[in-house]
Amino acid sequence: MMLRLLSSLLLVAVASGYGPPSSHSSSRVVHGEDAVPYSWPWQVSLQYEKSGSFYHTCGGSLIAPDWVVTAGHCISRDLTYQVVLGEYNLAVKEGPEQVIPINSEELFVHPLWNRSCVACGNDIALIKLSRSAQLGDAVQLASLPPAGDILPNKTPCYITGWGRLYTNGPLPDKLQQARLPVVDYKHCSRWNWWGSTVKKTMVCAGGYIRSGCNGDSGGPLNCPTEDGGWQVHGVTSFVSAFGCNFIWKPTVFTRVSAFIDWIEETIASH
């Protein structure tokens, strides 16, 4: 549902080290593939209530037993939410799922987030769960990078989510993944790429073949560590309004390492 789109200056919010990625190729996330079940065990589905049923709207990452990080544009005070942990196939109850209600007063959007200016940055929010997650094989905590950490150009990261399979396309049932190499700020901020739209508190990844799309918003950009693990370096924020995988418009993420202090302060005070 969410994932900000920007056409040149119009974006669209994509409102989108554990287990090896699957090796087969198909066409998902926008030219991604089905993830190995529960291979990204910090991935969550943020769902909103409508007419008595809940529907997937955004992704998120479990960063503490009772805290999830997602995108600011995923949060509306007018909606009722739940978080589903241990999810893989949205259409089937498979057993590991943990459904946790969210209290509206436990939604913490970054104070500088401006819904009318996605390109201004600060597209990040924290959700305090109404009860702690039960950790296990299918539900684990994400690791976050150190404050200020910047990934080198072409770092091979993975986006994960249940976003549309292509622009205006269908939503998948199974969790999707796609390999998105990091595009550093020097390249991503070129005038014929994202220009001044992209800020240093963001991270770009991917290209015109693989990208995030609507429904991936808030989900993680998972990047490898030297010890064989993974860190969540990005929160999926926006793509071009011309299309989810438009040339010279890589997917843009909120750079998690730019907000470590805010994350730690918010959790400590609540």
Curated annotation (Swiss-Prot):
Residues 16-28 form a propeptide. One of its GO terms (biological process) is proteolysis. It comes from Homo sapiens. The gene is CELA3A. GO terms for cellular component: extracellular space. InterPro entries: Peptidase_S1_Elastase_sf, Peptidase_S1_PA, Peptidase_S1_PA_chymotrypsin, Peptidase_S1A, Trypsin_dom, TRYPSIN_HIS, TRYPSIN_SER. One of its GO terms (molecular function) is serine-type endopeptidase activity. Residues 29-268 form the Peptidase S1 domain. This is Chymotrypsin-like elastase family member 3A. Residues 1-15 form the signal peptide. Glycans are attached at residue 114. It catalyses: Preferential cleavage: Ala-|-Xaa. Does not hydrolyze elastin. Belongs to the peptidase S1 family. Elastase subfamily. PROSITE patterns: TRYPSIN_DOM, TRYPSIN_HIS, TRYPSIN_SER. PANTHER family: CHYMOTRYPSIN-LIKE ELASTASE FAMILY MEMBER, CHYMOTRYPSIN-LIKE ELASTASE FAMILY MEMBER 3A. Its EC number is 3.4.21.70. Keywords: Disulfide bond, Glycoprotein, Hydrolase, Protease, Serine protease, Signal, Zymogen. Gene3D superfamilies: Trypsin-like serine proteases. Disulfide bonds join 58-74, 117-120, 157-223, 188-204, 213-244. The active site is at 73 (charge relay system), 123 (charge relay system), 217 (charge relay system). It comes from the Eukaryota.
